[in-house]
Regions:
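Sequence signature of WD/YWTD-type beta-propeller architectures
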Residues: 1-317
Length: 317
């Protein structure tokens, strides 16, 4: 499990109303990934935020608050993947893809950069959307970027870039899905740049590990795509398109929506966007599989309310 109080404060989502006990500590030793014995209900810490933050770095800034998110077991349940995130000097987020044994051994950092959603393909390979090891990310992570003058210039530049990116749909900033080997010296290779040009929420088929189900974010028409993808043949099969809601959130409730959220999160997103996300109007498809792999199951709000849907894909695979 994760520290959802810390995740809510720093990640912008989680469980509201639970105070982060480590809100003054940039990398607490009593917060991290926990394991619970389902029989005895005993809870122990597998790895702390402090251990992860200190791993593989020569020095660590006390100005950056760190947190862990997006846990995922490999098929053999022998290793756990997760994302380590912290705020860079320019206000952006740095993400590290990490793995650790379920016994707490062999902590590894596989990739670092702008990294998003992922899943295990097999016991030793993870595919994740983003970019890793770029010069741009290395520059942004430099302490000099905390200089007020430089931060102001960067803020303006980022607004221009986001404006341009928002008007087009395609491969952004050298990002794509990356196949990452879970080893001490991870091999990383990009794939499917043209077939999957934007971020989504992939999940590998439980029985046929070459296949995954995935989605993407709304296009200019407000529609999300649901599709299957073969990771070996690099073959995409679209299943459907589902429209988002264009309603606006009740901004009179913004104090409720924003309560307990870190100021850096509030500075990185508009009030309207964050309120839309918190109001329940935002609904990613988040596709996943039924246990037998026959059904692709997803969330959607295209009929006006949040519902769970399923599609029989057994005749396709």
């Amino acid at each position: 499990g994760l520290d959802y109080a810390r995740l809510y404060r720093l990640g912008g989502y989680g469980y509201a109303g639970i105070p982060d006990k480590g809100h003054l500590d940039p990398y607490p030793s009593d917060s991290g990934i926990t394991v619970m014995d389902m029989r005895t209900k005993e809870i122990r810490t597998l790895v702390s935020v402090k251990q992860v933050a200190e791993f593989g770095v020569s020095n660590i800034s006390s100005a950056a608050h760190h947190y862990l998110t997006h846990l995922s077991l490999n098929p053999a349940s022998s290793r756990i993947a997760f994302l380590h995130r912290y705020f860079m000097p320019d206000g952006g987020l740095m993400t590290r893809l990490m793995t650790i044994g379920t016994d707490g051994s062999e902590l590894r950092c596989l990739a670092q950069g702008f990294l998003s959603h992922y899943d295990w393909q097999d016991d030793s390979h993870i595919y994740i959307y983003g970019r890793s090891g770029s010069t741009v990310d290395a520059m942004r992570n430099n302490p000099i970027m905390s200089n007020p003058i430089i931060k102001c210039s960067l803020r303006l530049a980022k607004k221009v870039i986001k404006s341009v990116i928002g008007k087009q749909r395609g491969i952004v900033g050298g990002m794509s899905f990356l196949m990452v080997e879970d080893s001490m010296r991870a091999n990383i290779s990009a794939f499917a740049k043209e077939l999957i040009p934007s971020d989504g929420h992939p999940m590998t088929h439980p029985n046929m590990r070459d296949w995954c189900v995935c989605d993407n974010y709304p296009d200019l028409e407000g529609c999300r795509d649901l599709f299957l993808f073969n990771l070996i043949q690099l073959k995409r099969i679209d299943i459907g398109r589902y429209r988002r809601l264009f309603e606006t959130p009740d901004m009179s409730l913004k104090e409720i929506y924003f309560d307990g959220v870190d100021k850096k999160i509030l500075a990185s997103i508009s009030e309207e966007q964050l309120a839309f996300t918190r109001s329940g109007l935002h609904c990613d498809l988040h596709p996943r599989w039924s246990a037998n792999g026959k059904w692709a199951v997803f969330d959607s709000i295209h009929e006006g309310t949040r519902q769970i849907y399923k599609v029989d894909v057994s005749d396709i695979l």
